[in-house]
Structure formats: structure tokens, C-alpha cells
């Protein structure tokens, strides 16, 4: 679904923008927003890794049953819930058991490694940059989307999508394997690039 949306958006919005800008400027915009998406995603990922690393290191230095609750909430979906609950119940009955403590430290290291090795593939950040450009250059163009039964102006569509990406990025729900801040990075860099270009030329379609 995510890939289909990207391909559809690239065709729908990209073809209009390429006709407006021309192939050269379109490619410049596409690559810059793609790089901007990667930059913001990398920055956010490094911050998240640092946060997890600090918590894990604190736990490894002073492991305990109570402290493990805080730790496993970081990425509890890494392990089977039933298996984890069984382990916690057993450990609760014998909190000084060194084998349980050692196993909890292994879980802590696994959480950190999982955070360090999260793969990221795709160019959807650049696609969201195109979506932002469409909304800025053709703000009052009506869009008819399958999942929205009424026509909606491009500027409002972009605002809604941007707000949803920000909410989902901040929420960081378990199992959500979408790089929301990459999408926001593409939109952010696209916004500043269009503002820069419009200093010399102001064209807005309606």
C-alpha cells in the first residue's frame, strides 16, 4: 500500500510539477528533498538511538526487576508478549535470581541492537516533497481522492497529511515501520527551496 501510494503520488503530482518547472528544475527539487528527508530522518534516528543507549546503559549498570519495566516499555514489541510476561512472573517470584538478571541484561542489549539496526529503504520523503510543492504552487486546485468522498483543496490536503505525519512520528507507535520524519524532512526542505526560488520568480496557479 505504501509503495502504491508513492508511485501514484509521483505520477499524479510529479507530472504536473515537471511540466511547470521543466525536467531540470524538477530533478533538482526531487533530489534535494530526498536528501533533506534522509538528513532529518538520520538526525531523529541518532537522537532516538542516544536515548535508548542511555537507558540501556543505566539498566546494565544497575539491573533490577522494577527497572526492567521501564526498559522493556521502550521496545517491548521486540519479544513475544506472552513469553515476556511469563519471564516477568517468574522473576517477580525470585528477584535475586542471577539467571533472570542475566537474561534481562541480554534483553537490554537486544533492544539496543534492534534500535541500531533498523533498516530504512525508500524515496517517499522526496514524494512528500512533491506533495508539498503541489499544495504551494496550486493551492486552490481541487483534488478528488478515493478515500475522501468530497473534493478538497490541495493546500488543505497537504496540511492534513503533514499534520498526520507529525502526529505519527511523535507517537512512534510500536510496529509502525514508516519513516515519518523522512516524509516531514522532504516537505520541510521542499518548503524552503520553493521559498528561495520564489524570491526571484513568483508564480502561483489557481
List each model region and its residues.
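A detector for small-residue-rich transmembrane helices and their helix-helix packing motifs
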Residues: 1-206
Amino acid at each position: 500500500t505504501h509503495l502504491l501510494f508513492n508511485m501514484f503520488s509521483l505520477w499524479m503530482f510529479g507530472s504536473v510539477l515537471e511540466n511547470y518547472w521543466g525536467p531540470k528544475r524538477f530533478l533538482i527539487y526531487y533530489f534535494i528533498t530526498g536528501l533533506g528527508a534522509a538528513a532529518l530522518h538520520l538526525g531523529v534516528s541518532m537522537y532516538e538511538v542516544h536515548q535508548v543507549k542511555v537507558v540501556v546503559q543505566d539498566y546494565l549498570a544497575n539491573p533490577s526487576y522494577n527497572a526492567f519495566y521501564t526498559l522493556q516499555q521502550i521496545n517491548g514489541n521486540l519479544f513475544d508478549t506472552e513469553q515476556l510476561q511469563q519471564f516477568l512472573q517468574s522473576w517477580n517470584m525470585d528477584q535475586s535470581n542471577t539467571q533472570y538478571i542475566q537474561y534481562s541484561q541480554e534483553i537490554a542489549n537486544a533492544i539496543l541492537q534492534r534500535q541500531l539496526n533498523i533498516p530504512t529503504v525508500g524515496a517517499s520523503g522526496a514524494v512528500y516533497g512533491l506533495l508539498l510543492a503541489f499544495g504551494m504552487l496550486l493551492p486552490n486546485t481541487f483534488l478528488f481522492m478515493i478515500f475522501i468522498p468530497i473534493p478538497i483543496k490541495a493546500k488543505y490536503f497537504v496540511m492534513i497529511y503533514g499534520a498526520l505525519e507529525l502526529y505519527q512520528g511523535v507517537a512512534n507507535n510500536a510496529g509502525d515501520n514508516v519513516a515519518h520524519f523522512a516524509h516531514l524532512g522532504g516537505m520541510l526542505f521542499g518548503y524552503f527551496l520553493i521559498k528561495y526560488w520564489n524570491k526571484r520568480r513568483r508564480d502561483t496557479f489557481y
